[in-house]
Amino acid sequence: HQIREHDNVVLAVGGGIGTPERAADLLTGRWSERHGVVAMPVDAILVGTAAMATAESTASASVKELLAQTQGVTGWVTRGAFEAGMTSGLSGLNADIHFVDNSASRAAALLDEVAGDETAVQERRTEIIDALSRTAKPYFGDVEHMTYAQLLRRYAELAAVGSGNRYQDGVWLDRTHRTRFQDLLQRTEARLHPNDTGLIESRFSDLESLNDPAVAIKQLLADHPAARVAQLHPADVDYFLVVCRQPGKPVPFVPVIDADVRRWYQSDALWQSHDPHYDADEVLIIPGPTAVAGISEPDEPVAELMSRFERAALDDLPTAPRTTLLDSLLTARTVEWGGAMRPNPLRRIGTWQVRDGVATWHSRDESAR
């Protein structure tokens, strides 16, 4: 009632509202009657999860299909459990979060079990690599066993997958992915150059020369054919991790299997659900565990979605309870009296009923008056 004392406040609620019926329940106020109080309608509802698969949503087509197939639950899913197409785990910020049950979320669950424990990680190293291989953020590979050419090709394979949209840098997912590739190329040039001292002029000082990474690698191999067979120097193995840790958009792969493997995996791990380059099974998807049940078909126009919610509320208006001042007074459990909340004295008299605007009451031992 304190909220309703302010005429400049609009009361909007959200979270778990996946169906028009649930929305109508809130807009008409029926929801509160289940708790033994008068109808308490809200002014607006917030639709989130239910709109994730609409035509206007930027989620990929396969993700929309999976959302429509996900049954959802009526309550919470405990951490690490899998129920009705949903699971629960930890986000990259160590907060509880719900995921759709798929290969990506199962990999996340595995990493939750070993996060921060180097011994446990190494004991399950093969299992972890296998789980990551089925996700959009695979293990990069054992860099210490790679040649320079293999390193560069693997990096380009995983990072140069951009479609050139306004958030990307040409074929690169981000400008910092381009600059990291430049760092790796120049490190290779320096390592394989015949001169051991002095400045070495790089062929790749201009970032525009990296618009096509395959061409850049071909140019490097023409200058330094030894890159095909030369295995990475131990110092360059460490340098690769330094490059991966540089500020900017996190790398789209797991560069090393260590105690921080969960952080590597969870960092920047949600955009893939909007990229058609990846299948829905490979990406983390985070709908509300209850509201996801309201998604019945992919690519429904959002206007039609809103119309369904609107119609359900309008259809319920004729039967929605009308709360009068008298209703509120007689059913209130407490009243404000003398600056304090006190038990409603009217409820001590007996049980009240309102018929045709007239109040009658029944005491415990007397008939209606």
Regions found by a protein language model. Give the residues of each.
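Alpha-helix-loop-beta-strand connector modules within alpha/beta enzyme cores
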Residues: H1-G14, G18, R22
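Conserved active-site-proximal phosphate/metal-binding subdomains
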Residues: Q2-N8, L27-R369
